[in-house]
Design a protein with these regions (language model features):
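Outer-envelope exported proteins of Gram-negative bacteria
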Residues: 52, 213-215, 219, 293, ...
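Alpha-amylase-like alpha-glycosidases and glucanotransferases acting on alpha-linked glucans and related
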Residues: 6-10, 15-17, 23, 61-197, ...
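Short, Lys/Arg-enriched N-terminal segments with co-localized hydrophobic residues
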Residues: 1-5
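Surface-exposed amphipathic alpha-helices with a cationic face
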Residues: 42, 200-208, 333, 357-358
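N-terminal catalytic cores of NTP/NDP-binding nucleotidyl/phosphoryl-transfer enzymes
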Residues: 13, 17-38
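Catalytic domains of carbohydrate-active enzymes, especially glycoside hydrolases
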Residues: 7, 32-57, 289-291, 437
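Conserved, well-ordered alpha-helix/loop/beta-strand core segments that scaffold catalytic motifs
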Residues: 189, 193-222
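In a subset of proteins, long, contiguous C-terminal domains/tails are tracked
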Residues: 455-507
Length: 507
């Protein structure tokens, strides 16, 4: 049976990652500006706030390469909340060097300052009942993660694959000895997670109370250098010497002649099935507690996934293998009931992927920017071709902003776009793009904040397959009443505004 996700009501939302919120401490956090953004969303007639993965960032500061599929990102913790709790003094936070430019995140500086301040707060912290309840409730992932991070710290943050053999292979007596010797470091990571989830839960409760639902994001693969792979190597394509045998990526295409080599280990789906898909059930269940709805990245891999030999230097010589398909989602529905999932089904997908999507009943994604390619009016990404059960975007975190794209697109595509959105001199072009997506049959329309603000390519969040300079864009100041009025007007005009009764009912 298909889930009640099919009842996605006509509505709209905004894509803005937490790190992009304005703040004086170099990075957006779960503090006051996040609560103010919820107020802005409400005033703007919106129903959803979509964020990128909120897990700790690892390689190249990407939220899609995390040392944990379950932990929260310490960089998102609001330091001023720690002042209110008496764990820090205002002077501890003020006058530090968090980075010069208020419109970007300087990760190196932010990480150095936050690490020091969180340590300082930890030394003042006294364990209480709610802390003890948290570490008990979350022990199923938290203990492994805290231990993993503590060992990593004592190995100069090097990958676990370079650790001493006994630690790599998780010899119980060696782990027990390490725990005993470094218990304070382990407790520090528990404390940081407690603070993160306390703040996250407070923000989510405030959003829900104000009729705003949060859409999260699950990266499809775990990072090789993660607690998840270190603890569960048998669930991945990892051999007995703990080396990957097959890794993830996508084959060559028009944009990328040698394909994309992501390097994450793949899932051993046979082992996962024997285990009752327990790891994925835990992951989706955890996400459903964190968010109201969740986007699963690279959804096509559940049908067919591309497997590349681990020693390959490009993605040219991989092969397609069969994923778990409906077996996984039937198990999810049986164990967790109906779950609100958005399937990221972008790119060149097989008919079997379309069938899986249809069998699950999950909405897929459409991106207007992709509509102005060589397919002309038949492109599924042009608004008139949208189905009702989909989530439509002007662009995602992997696209240029609308204004950036208009400048860099080839003349033919830009001309087609301007004609399609009926760009005229009465409103800014970014607004015409938003209007087109809002007017479409898509049940849910999500607009990146950069496109609402009409920011050029400097607001781009990520350029796929590049390292460095990504994930850094920030709003210099909070969104204003003028932009809220504009979005409210569009949400009202295109029947996407939540009715007062619907909001009351959702509570």
């Amino acid at each position: 049976p298909k889930g009640d996700i099919m009842e996605l009501k006509r509505s709209s939302g905004v894509l803005l990652h937490i790190t992009s919120l304005p703040a004086n401490e170099g990075i957006g956090t779960l503090g006051k500006p996040a609560f103010e953004f919820v107020n802005w969303l409400k005033a703007a007639g919106q129903k959803y706030w979509q964020v990128l993965p909120i897990h700790p960032t690892g390689y190249a500061d990407s939220p899609y390469q995390s040392p944990s599929a379950f932990a929260g990102n310490p960089l998102l913790i609001d330091l001023w909340e720690l002042v209110e709790l008496g764990l820090l003094a205002p002077d501890d936070i003020k006058g530090r060097e968090y980075g010069e430019d208020p419109s970007t995140v300087d990760y190196e500086k932010v990480i150095a300052q936050k690490k020091e301040l969180l340590r300082k707060a930890f030394f003042s912290f006294k364990e209480d009942v709610s802390y003890l309840a948290f570490i008990q409730e979350q022990s199923w992932w938290l203990e492994d993660y805290a231990l993993f991070m503590a060992i990593k710290q004592h190995n100069e943050l090097r990958s676990w694959m370079t650790w001493d053999k006994e630690l790599r292979f998780r010899k119980p007596e060696v782990l027990a000895a390490f725990k005993e010797e470094h218990i304070e470091d382990i407790k520090f990571h528990r404390f940081v997670q407690y603070m993160f989830f306390t703040q996250w839960n407070k923000l989510k409760a405030y959003a829900n109370k104000n009729g705003i639902s949060i859409i999260g994001d699950i990266p499809i693969y775990a990072a090789m250098d993660s607690a998840d792979v270190w603890v569960n190597p048998k669930l991945f394509t990892i051999d007995i010497s703990l080396r990957p045998t097959l890794v993830a990526g996508v084959p060559p295409d028009y944009f990328s002649p040698t394909g994309q080599l992501w390097g994450n280990p793949l899932y051993d789906w046979d082992a996962m099935e024997r285990d009752g898909y327990n790891w994925w059930l835990s992951r989706i269940d955890h996400a459903m507690k964190l968010y109201d709805m969740v986007r699963i990245d690279h959804f096509r891999a559940f049908d067919t996934y591309y497997a590349i030999p681990a020693d390959a230097t490009t993605a040219e010589y991989g092969e397609w293998k069969k994923g778990p398909g409906m077996k996984l989602f039937d198990t999810v529905r049986e164990k967790l009931g109906d779950v609100n999932i958005i399937a990221e089904d972008l790119g060149d997908i097989f008919d079997s992927v379309k069938k899986l999507l249809s069998d699950t009943g999950f909405p897929g994604m459409r991106v207007l920017q992709f509509g102005f390619n060589s397919e002309g009016k038949d492109s599924i990404h042009l608004c008139h071709n949208y189905v009702n059960n989909c989530v439509a975007y002007t662009g995602t975190h992997d696209n240029d902003t609308i204004m950036g794209w208009l400048k860099s697109a080839d003349a033919k595509a830009a001309k087609m776009a301007k004609s399609y959105i009926n760009a005229n001199f009465l409103e800014h072009k970014n607004v015409s793009f938003i209007r087109s997506v809002y007017a479409s049959p898509a049940a849910l329309a999500i607009i990146p904040m950069q496109d609402i603000l009409g920011i050029d390519g400097r607001g781009r969040m990520n350029v796929p397959s590049t390292v460095g300079g990504n994930w850094t864009w920030r709003m210099k100041k909070p969104a204003n009443k003028k932009s809220a009025r504009l979005m409210n007007k569009l949400a009202t005009a295109y029947l996407r505004k939540p009715s007062v009764t619907a909001n009351a009912k959702d509570k």
